[in-house]
């Protein structure tokens, strides 16, 4: 097995970018989801209620985050504060009281105008700390293999992702789904619908469901359980248009047998190796 795709999402819910190599630090991939859009109360905003977020592209330079959107032009945001930045208390799902740096009025106005809602961009700074939280055990969809989060430790930290710093999926799993879609007259969907960090090849479809630990290159990961999917998978990541697929088809065969409200595709991961580098082409080994 090999790593065939490596993706960064500099701002949560904005368009991601493929990279050939990426460094790893305590929070995950360097440059991945270090920025977040929040409302006036500090609650995170995502494509779920705001599919227009998919229309904003991201680019990282050595010193700045560049945001672009058709009709709105481009705006640049420093990766690090050049002076003490105002702090905002923000929340993401079960993570409350997170301290982040406000990125300023200019980008707030730019985003608010484009998205049509008052909002602010915040950045991970020195005071940010977000531990990976324990979750209940879930069965892998289509199997009864338990995936238990009983090894979460205090050093397991992460960024502004939903629940875990990494998401892995196999090319074979997407191919299996697309075969089903085509067989019922639907269009195949690209990998970007699932916003993975890591894409692997050389294993059967849904083999990742059963991985408890995996090594990619020199980096070892621990399973955080299957990823429950939402309406973001039905959102075209370039047009922002939303349909019914692939979630409707996934619901026919990828429901969690212990909780049918959860529809699984891809596997959450926590990195046990807290520094290093991942490269497309790295060997992948199930441990």
Can you name each region flagged by the protein language model?
Residues 1-287:
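Metal-cofactor-dependent catalytic cores
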């Amino acid at each position: 097995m090999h790593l065939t795709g490596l993706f960064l999402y500099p701002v949560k819910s904005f368009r991601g970018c493929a990279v050939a190599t990426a460094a790893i630090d305590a929070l995950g991939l360097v440059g991945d989801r270090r920025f977040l859009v929040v409302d006036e109360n500090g609650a995170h905003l995502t494509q779920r209620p705001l599919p227009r977020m998919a229309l904003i592209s991201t680019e990282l330079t050595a010193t700045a985050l560049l945001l672009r959107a058709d009709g709105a032009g481009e705006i640049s945001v420093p990766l690090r504060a050049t002076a003490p930045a105002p702090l905002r208390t923000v929340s993401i799902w079960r993570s409350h009281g997170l301290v982040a740096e406000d990125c300023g009025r200019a980008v707030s106005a730019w985003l608010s105008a484009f998205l049509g809602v008052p909002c602010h961009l915040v950045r991970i700074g020195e005071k940010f700390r977000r531990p990976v939280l324990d979750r209940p055990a879930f069965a892998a969809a289509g199997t009864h293999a338990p995936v238990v989060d009983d090894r979460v430790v205090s050093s397991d930290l992460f960024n502004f992702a939903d629940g875990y710093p990494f998401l892995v999926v196999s090319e074979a799993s997407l191919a299996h789904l697309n075969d089903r879609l085509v067989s019922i007259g639907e269009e195949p969907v690209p990998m970007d619908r699932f916003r993975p960090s890591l894409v692997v090849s050389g294993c059967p479809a849904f083999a990742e469901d059963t991985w408890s630990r995996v090594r990619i290159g020199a980096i070892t990961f621990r399973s955080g359980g299957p990823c429950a999917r939402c309406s973001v998978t039905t959102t075209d990541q370039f047009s922002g248009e939303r349909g019914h697929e692939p979630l409707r088809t996934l619901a026919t065969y990828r429901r969690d047998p212990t909780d049918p409200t959860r529809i699984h595709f891809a596997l959450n991961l926590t990195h046990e190796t807290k520094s290093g580098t991942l490269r497309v082409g790295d060997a992948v080994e199930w441990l």
